[in-house]
Every structure is written in structure tokens, then in C-alpha cells.
């Protein structure tokens, strides 16, 4: 999650938080700081509680690395934002029997479509 308020990741996270979701920021460069009132973790595996959705804003070429990080958690859904998809990442997840995968969709847009 970016600390820059103009960044898409920040805007989407802020929107979802206002809608009632708990947003846990992950950013190695901001580790230990606070964003949106929550502690920032360096890596997904550092989060000491269950994760429902990992919402990824990293470029597509980094999705396989994020998929491996995802597998180190008990997270339920791997979600990459609009414009982000990677077949290798999907294969990594499916081979590990992690089937709840959404790519190339925006969580904010989907929330608006389903609930507003």
C-alpha cells in the first residue's frame, strides 16, 4: 500500500476502509509506520492474524513473487487490480490448491457494482 494519497492503492484502500473493511497495509519500505490507522507490515507473512483478501497493486511481472508470498499465509483470496494479471502467478496458486483467484479487476469497482 502506498502512503501517497494520489496513488490508486491508497484511494482504493481508503474507500474500502470507509465501507467497513479492515485494511492491513503491506509495504517493506514503510514497515513499522502507520497508514490508514493501521500498522504497516513488511511482508504478508508478518501479519499475525488471518487474512481474507490480498489485494495486489504491484506490476504484473511481480505477481509470481507475490503469489509465493501469498502461499506463506492463510489468506483466502488472491486479487490483482485492473491491468494486472500473470499466468505464471495463477499456475503457482492453482498448483498449491489455492483456487480463489481474481485478476484484472478493481475491488472498489466490484464493491460499487455489487453493493451500491
Kindly label every feature range from the protein language model.
Residues 2-7, 13-34:
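NAD(P)-binding Rossmann-fold cofactor-contacting core
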Residues 14, 45, 64-72:
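Amphipathic, non-transmembrane alpha-helical secondary structure
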Residues 70-93:
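ADP-ribose/adenylate-binding Rossmann-like module
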Residues 1, 82-83, 105:
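Short secondary-structure boundary segments
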Residues 33-65:
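Glycine-rich, highly charged phosphate/nucleotide-binding loops
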Residues 49, 86-111:
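Short acidic, glycine/proline-enriched helix-loop-strand junctions
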Residues 19-21, 73-78, 96-100:
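A short helix->loop->beta-strand "cap" motif at the edges of active sites that frequently abuts
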Amino acid at each position: 500500500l502506498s502512503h501517497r494519497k494520489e496513488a490508486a492503492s491508497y484511494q482504493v484502500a481508503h474507500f474500502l476502509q470507509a465501507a467497513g473493511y479492515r485494511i492491513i497495509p503491506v509495504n517493506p519500505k514503510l514497515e513499522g509506520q502507520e497508514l490508514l490507522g493501521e500498522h504497516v507490515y513488511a511482508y504478508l507473512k508478518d501479519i499475525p492474524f488471518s487474512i481474507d483478501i490480498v489485494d495486489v497493486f504491484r506490476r504484473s511481472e511481480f505477481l509470481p513473487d507475490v503469489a509465493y508470498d501469498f502461499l506463506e499465509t492463510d489468506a483466502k483470496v488472491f486479487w490483482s487490480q485492473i491491468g494486472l494479471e500473470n499466468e505464471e502467478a495463477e499456475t503457482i496458486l492453482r498448483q498449491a490448491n489455492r483456487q480463489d483467484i481474481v485478476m484484472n479487476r478493481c475491488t472498489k469497482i466490484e464493491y460499487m457494482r455489487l453493493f451500491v
